[in-house]
Amino acid sequence: MKFMISWKIAPGHHRPAGEAFLKSGAPTPEGLTLIGRWHAAGSATGWALVEGDDPTALAEHTAQWADLLEIQATPVIEDNEAAQVLARVYGG
């Protein structure tokens, strides 16, 4: 399953968040594969697309950053998967 993680650096935490990222590289825990990560230039927001079947790995990853970032993780599907769902629902 794929999850889109979005984050915003908590107010007053930009420097510690940046230092933590530089120190660790923000690796994902076992059971979670990083597909891509993007940072909005000049802002405190970013996104990461991860894949894994173990929801506890996702919980672990977000918990590791929860003191510095406001985080949301959303399950996402690709176009072909969405098309299959729409075909079932709307008979296409």
Where on the chain are the PLM-derived regions?
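Conserved, structured core segments of small domains
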Residues: 1-92
